Amino acid sequence: MNSSDYSMYFSAKTMMGPNSARILEELFTKYPLHLTEKDEVLDLGCGTGLTSLIIAKETGAKVYANDLWIRAEDNAKRFEQWGVGEQIIPVHEDANELSFDQKRFAALVSIDSYHYFAGKINFFENKILPFLKNKSVVLIGIPGMKDEYSGRSEELLSEWLGDEAHMFKSISQWKKIIGNSDRIETIKVWEMDCFNIAWNEWFATNHEYANGDKKYFEAIIKPYTCFIGVYIAIK
């Protein structure tokens, strides 16, 4: 995958934070998804569907684009405009109450959203794992704390994030939160390389939220935070 192939979709209308396409590109480079048009992927916390578009184009699979904040009807219109209306199904459900059939998905992808709803121990095993097929793959890319500042998110980030600072966790914390279910074959968690470019492309949109983030970048965001990649192979 080359995220530059999708640069025409990078705008203040489609981006809701640091460029999700760059985060997804790094995940796909390290752990490519080998899927077919018969496979189904859940894009959990898809936002305006930019990641769903890329997943659909890169894998050929059917994508279920789920987000709680963006109306399914709005994403459906976008997918039609992008020419992928038949390949991507927009969904509007709470990640805590997903209603899909069990063992349905060959892969789950979640970019810049998993930390909002999944920061409790046993969430993955109880709320996500039931919907994953045997031999499926999970790819997650989220903002978090550099490991040397583990457990200090509220102390260090509250000026920027307010009440949401507690959502930023370190690599070691995420390993513990995801757990070691009997169905997990492999789990890899690492600090991602796409930090600067993802943030810079967000700032380039001139979105009001991007401008707000930019004020804190040098003093808070850059010194203490990172993007965390997660790869999970299911037995």
Language model: regions and residue ranges:
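Conserved class I S-adenosyl-L-methionine
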Residues: 1-35, 50, 200
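Class I SAM-dependent methyltransferase SAM/SAH-binding core
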Residues: 42, 48-97
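A conserved beta-strand element that flanks and buttresses the S-adenosyl-L-methionine
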Residues: 109
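A short His-aromatic
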Residues: 115-117
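A short glycine-rich, Lys/Arg-flanked "PGG" loop and its adjoining helix->strand segment in the class I
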Residues: 122-137
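Short, glycine-/aromatic-enriched active-site segment of Class I SAM-dependent methyltransferases
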Residues: 143-165
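Short alpha-helix
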Residues: 166-182
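Conserved Class I S-adenosyl-L-methionine
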Residues: 188-235
